[in-house]
A protein has these predicted regions:
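Extracellular, repeat-based ectodomains that mediate carbohydrate processing or recognition
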Residues: 1-131
């Protein structure tokens, strides 16, 4: 379990982390008696988060082996990647914010090709993927 701490534009700090099958967050400073808030219950692996447009965005692999992008408090989660019929596996998820856009870099293992490839997608833009 590794905490990721983010500071928002209003100065509020947020700690976000995965534990067991849960994704949790809490506002800082953390006072005695406060409990973290569970936002997801289907976490499996590969947790990564960034602040994008003053919102904490996070990505992870869920229990169904799909890659999910979600935000703290804003809108529904989005399925970004699925394993498909070829049996892909995903790892090394890395969110990057650059020039006002959000990018997801990841590696995918293809059972057919027996190797990893490096890919990038822009989760908030349709059909914007690259190798």
């Amino acid at each position: 379990m590794a905490y990721q701490i983010f500071e928002m534009s209003d100065g509020q700090r947020v700690a976000l982390y995965a534990q067991g099958n849960s994704v949790l967050y809490c506002l800082l400073p953390f006072a005695r008696g406060m409990l973290p808030i569970e936002v997801k219950r289907d976490y499996l692996a590969h947790f990564e988060a960034r602040v994008f447009r003053d919102t904490v965005c996070y990505v992870y692999e869920n229990l169904e082996h799909t890659i999910i992008l979600d935000t703290l408090g804003n809108g529904p989660a989005r399925i970004i990647l699925t394993d498909g019929p070829l049996g892909y596996g995903f790892c090394n998820l890395h969110l990057v914010v650059r020039d006002g856009d959000l990018y997801l870099f990841y590696q995918a293992f293809s059972g057919r090709e027996k190797g990893y490839g490096l890919y990038v997608c822009m989760p908030y833009q349709e059909n914007c993927r690259g190798v």
